[in-house]
Regions:
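Short, well-structured hydrophobic secondary-structure segments
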Residues: 51, 56, 60-61
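Conserved beta-strand-loop-beta-strand hairpin that lines the nucleotide-binding pocket
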Residues: 1-12, 60-136
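A generic alpha-helix structural signal
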Residues: 22-25, 56, 112
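Short beta-to-alpha transition helix within the HATPase_c
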Residues: 7-27
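Long, low-complexity, intrinsically disordered polar/charged segments
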Residues: 21-32, 85, 128
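Conserved short strand/loop->alpha-helix "switch" segment adjacent to the catalytic nucleotide/phosphoryl-transfer site
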Residues: 29-53
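Charged catalytic carboxylate motif
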Residues: 20, 24, 47, 51, ...
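Short, structured helix-loop boundary elements
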Residues: 18, 41-45, 105
Length: 136
């Protein structure tokens, strides 16, 4: 069995954390190329970075204190996990194009094969799993 490629980073939640998380994720995706024998397709890479942005934005917006992001790759999928200090799970809204705001998790759920959120000691953990090569 192949060991997953992992990267974990802790953020303060201050200005610049979202850009730093995207940069970390972009570098992580670049590091996948040797394991995959090809880079992550451009459109899919952008979708992965969008999911990172949405999860990290929510952590910074709704949780006091620092948060941590872990990226892993195994079995053709990237898993993005964000831990934060709020025990409040993300709300699930019905799609509504007239609603202002609250679309982040809706976008994440649409792009990902699986999204889970659970309370853990000291806060919550949200994990999004995306197939790198989108199924036909």
């Amino acid at each position: 069995m192949t060991e997953p490629l992992r990267r974990s980073v802790r953020y303060s939640g201050r200005d610049g954390s979202i850009a730093a998380a995207r940069d970390t994720a972009a570098a992580f995706l670049d590091d996948l190329a040797p394991d995959r024998a090809a880079p992550v397709p451009g459109e899919r890479a952008e979708e992965i970075l969008l999911v990172v942005s949405e999860l990290v934005t929510n952590a910074g917006r709704y949780a006091p204190g620092p948060y941590e992001m872990e990226l892993s790759y195994c079995g053709g999928a990237v898993e993005i996990t964000v831990w934060d200090t709020s025990s409040q799970l993300p709300r699930r809204f019905e799609p509504d194009p007239l609603r202002i705001g609250g679309h982040g998790m809706e976008i994440v759920r649409r792009l990902c094969r699986q999204v889970t959120a659970e309370r853990v000691h000291g806060g919550k953990r949200v994990t999004a799993r995306l197939d790198v090569d989108r199924p036909a």
